[in-house]
Regions:
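Outer-membrane beta-barrel pore domains
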Residues: 1-144
Length: 144
């Protein structure tokens, strides 16, 4: 590799009603020795709704979303949907294409503890060979 440039754009919208939309788009421009200049790209868009109305506060100084703080004693349930795509086909490089759709439910027990279940479907396409995979993921997360 003679060099590479990465460009990214990220956005978040979060409101008091518990709704939020988050997205990111990334492009990598690579000057490869054998393959010349190639471009790879990817993005995701995520939507969520906290059923009890909580939201993630946004810190404009640091450009980060704060932690969700459950109001009630029993925490805060959150419905989540996400679509993501990565395209690694460019010029002579055929790295493939990946697409994924996820639907999930998170339960924020406290500001630090989250339990989540996500069901997803993944589509892969490389060298004209296509595949589909279904997934179910669970996560117990502690945020320090």
């Amino acid at each position: 590799v003679n060099g590479a440039n990465h460009f990214g754009l990220e956005a978040l919208y979060s409101n008091v009603g518990g709704w939020s939309v988050q997205s990111e788009y990334v492009v990598a421009r690579v000057d490869a020795v054998d393959s010349g200049k190639v471009n790879f790209r990817g993005f995701y868009i995520l939507g969520s709704w906290v059923l009890t109305g909580e939201f993630r506060p946004y810190n404009r100084t640091t450009g980060t979303a704060g932690r969700l703080e459950p109001k009630g004693r029993w925490g805060a349930p959150e419905l989540v949907a996400r679509y993501s795509m990565v395209d690694l086909d460019s010029g002579a490089i055929q790295g493939g294409r990946y697409q994924r759709v996820d639907l999930g439910l998170n339960w924020w027990a406290t500001t630090q503890w989250k339990l989540g279940v996500v069901a997803g479907r993944v589509w892969l396409d490389r060298f004209g060979v296509q595949g589909v995979t279904d997934t179910v993921l669970t996560r117990l997360q502690w945020v320090y």
